[in-house]
Amino acid sequence: MSWAVVFGLLAALLLLLLLTRRRTRRPGEPPLDLGSIPWLGHALEFGKDAAGFLTRMKEKHGDIFTVLVGGRHVTVLLDPHSYDAVVWEPRSRLDFHAYAVFLMERIFDVQLPHYNPGDEKSKMKPTLLHKELQALTDAMYTNLRTVLLGDTVEAGSGWHEMGLLEFSYGFLLRAGYLTQYGVEAPPHTQESQAQDRVHSADVFHTFRQLDLLLPKLARGSLSAGDKDRVGKVKGRLWKLLSPTRLASRAHRSRWLESYLLHLEEMGVSEEMQARALVLQLWATQGNMGPAAFWLLLFLLKNPEALAAVRGELETVLLGAEQPISQMTTLPQKVLDSMPVLDSVLSESLRLTAAPFITREVVADLALPMADGREFSLRRGDRLLLFPFLSPQKDPEIYTDPEVFKYNRFLNPDGSEKKDFYKDGKRLKNYSLPWGAGHNQCLGKGYAVNSIKQFVFLVLTQFDLELITPDVDIPEFDLSRYGFGLMQPEHDVPVRYRIRP
């Protein structure tokens, strides 16, 4: 018998041993469900429809359980009263950095020396708050008008047709790109604005090709053709967002200047800086468009809700100091005086925001539950919270949780409703579209302002209609669970025109 055969047999025996060695539940640990396939466990079910799979597991095991997914043991926690015990736990016990770095490298080919997400967040946080937030908000309003009104005027009078997702995603990402990454250098003319529209459209259409393949990228399931396409798209984006190319742009945000300085201080090459800027384009702009899509679609399908929002915006305009055509900014005090639109946004996010909140278990620990129970977690496992199922879709918390109710987050007096209950106790975490704890989204204020400004402009400056009024709201693209805002399985055709 040759050595090659001997080694082959030994390798096969070792693989068989690894595949047949099954973990057993220890006293004090959550219920364990390994599935029927060695090593893979529930990977196929989880990847096909994470929400459906986790719903079945919750019905079977309760609000905490451990499942085997592709060789990893993942403990899933679905009790919102207990989420704070996870999201504020120190990194020495529950770490979210390792998984973030893994996705950063796998999806965007970004490798940063001595990367510390916590340090990066502390440096970038001031660029998204207070006066810097106001500067971003003002610039976003200007750039939304540039792309939204400018494109429509260029296309001529009358009705224009487009998919609602392309409409929302395209205009918001393009305006967001111009806001964060800069506009054409002075002088500021109609020609420079036209060039901004052309350039930002190029960025969006290229980015969208990558975005469509993002779930496959994250799971490592690209076909040979997909890999070739992804390589070309990434190369194009790296050129569009290279620091050298961006250096000539005007009115770059303080966020961009601070981020580039941060990369330079780490000694990151220009090529890697371009990759990091593509990552940041997705992180800062990738969810606003889908969020606006769902919000507008829910309004178009609910005449009462649409009338309530329009009425609120008309009141805002009546109190404005100048006509909307002359407004160069939408002040924060105006944005903060839209409780109906705030409720609509909160309800839309409740129904469609489905991020995973993950932590790597760095050391064996006891996880305290809000009801007094305690469960042991093993070092090397992964801990997963999925707020989309609970609290956001929990029928004990929300009556008719699958139904869009535009005033769900309003009290009878018109103020914001914050009191929601589960098991007779008031919830602190009653909806978590922005994450929670140490890795809550820093750009929440900027994103909310941007979405509200977009909706304000669309509903006050345009007529917007469904081409088929009785069209059904599309199902989710199930592959996007875990990545933030869900996207539809297919787009919804609309027509729009500037109001006469």
UniProtKB/Swiss-Prot annotation:
Heme binds at residue 441. Substrate binds at residues 106, 112, 287, 358-359, 382. It comes from the Eukaryota. The chain crosses the membrane at residues 1-20. One of its GO terms (biological process) is negative regulation of inflammatory response. GO terms for molecular function: heme binding; hydroperoxy icosatetraenoate dehydratase activity; iron ion binding; monooxygenase activity; oxidoreductase activity, acting on paired donors, with incorporation or reduction of molecular oxygen; prostaglandin-I synthase activity. It is found in: Endoplasmic reticulum membrane. It catalyses: prostaglandin H2 = prostaglandin I2; a hydroperoxyeicosatetraenoate = an oxoeicosatetraenoate + H2O; (15S)-hydroperoxy-(5Z,8Z,11Z,13E)-eicosatetraenoate = 15-oxo-(5Z,8Z,11Z,13E)-eicosatetraenoate + H2O; (15S)-hydroperoxy-(5Z,8Z,11Z,13E)-eicosatetraenoate + AH2 = (15S)-hydroxy-(5Z,8Z,11Z,13E)-eicosatetraenoate + A + H2O. Its EC number is 5.3.99.4, 4.2.1.152. Its cofactor is heme. Its main location: endoplasmic reticulum. It is a single-pass membrane protein. Keywords: Endoplasmic reticulum, Fatty acid biosynthesis, Fatty acid metabolism, Heme, Iron, Isomerase, Lipid biosynthesis, Lipid metabolism, Lyase, Membrane, Metal-binding, Prostaglandin biosynthesis, Prostaglandin metabolism, Transmembrane, Transmembrane helix. GO terms for cellular component: caveola; endoplasmic reticulum; endoplasmic reticulum membrane; nucleus. Catalyzes the biosynthesis and metabolism of eicosanoids. Catalyzes the isomerization of prostaglandin H2 to prostacyclin (= prostaglandin I2), a potent mediator of vasodilation and inhibitor of platelet aggregation. Additionally, displays dehydratase activity, toward hydroperoxyeicosatetraenoates (HPETEs), especially toward (15S)-hydroperoxy-(5Z,8Z,11Z,13E)-eicosatetraenoate (15(S)-HPETE). Belongs to the cytochrome P450 family. This is Prostacyclin synthase.
